[in-house]
């Protein structure tokens, strides 16, 4: 969940490193630092808190001259968030500095060994063992020392290392943590995310596990785990840095909410040709699939919960949803007749990767739905469908969720047509409804100008409940998550039919209850639950299709969405809940794009 950057060239490195770290802020962090080689010494500057603090400390890098360096944003896993534990970490002799993203599982064993040999530790981090191992193994060959040190590490790591003996060289190593090289002219880069590179180059090389890269201003050489040089082709990034800017909105999150109709259209349009859904390279014999398991974490898991209903209804195949953080430790009934659908915006979610590998080991074929091309999940999956959402900077996902759900809808209809469970007029009707989703999402954005006023009414509430049934319940899960993660208000989602089994005891006078009422098949039942909570003093904010007079007569406040087939409506139904969470958080003065304690990409377990 940390971010790392590296640079070597002819210009001052520190401003480049600071700029790169700023582009990685969305990943979440609690401290930041840079290290720049200055002749026979390495200048290290690090701070607790925001990158702006580091800019001020270094006067935007002017106080740290030098043309080769590394940088880091830290999200604490070992040791408290403070200046001492912040990266980069230096060797005792001052010859090396390292930045690290990941977790070293055997660091205590290595630390004890190094302490016995006389190495001094300044921090509580697992990372510091790495730089002392490099110093221990160094005998004049920088690369060999790193390879020997890496061979001792158990866990996940992306490393960037500099050495005073080779002041124009930076080395990068990857093992189970993303790392991308940026290919420049007279300068070269690395970063844990392409977002940090696109201001400088659009030509990138994705490192694989076990690979080491040696970067100088004029060259990049990649080596395999045995130290043999290998040739890797550069890929071209098609979007530029403007795609990652706020575009006039107060926050990235609001910008990304507003981008959703376009993102969903970009996900749908290339995949519908001549009245058919075309999913290139999805060469699955669906007749041999007896069960589908959807696994993910966080919002991606809730997208899977919503997609489950549509896939199961249209394809008539049993579908289960499993939290990846639980599935990886279970003993699941998975075999060669199981299709595993894996959802991850970044494609680097550690628990999801582990669950995916375990299910593949048991014979399942894995279909990945990810946003980031070249990500770990995309590479190890048997099949991959990209969401084409573009970069998502705010920690709380919006268009990542809706585009994942859109791909699940595409898959459901594609699979149903292939299996013969949906044909003819019904297929055409659903395909037309699918094509209309971007327009319906835009309508959902436009038809609720009162949401900021509703936020003013509800922002002081200590807790909220989100209720719904069937597909509405799946949307309630994500709506509650959005509210809690950016507004810091306790928000819980419940299947509406479960209220009587305990939760209704928590309803108090004035308690906000957000009721999702867009599934016609269960609307009457949900209405009875609205009556129950109102009888106990709850304030009900209902989400329903425009023109639903029955709900209007019951609810205290209304949010409307355009009429859509219930099997597809979650994509539009979530939009006003995203807006509600955003404006409530804004009323509460929260750090909307970077909520406390959260990280964008959870690349550690």
Map each language-model feature to its residues:
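Glycine-rich phosphate-binding loops that contact phosphosugars or nucleotide phosphates
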Residues: 288-436, 516-560, 580, 588
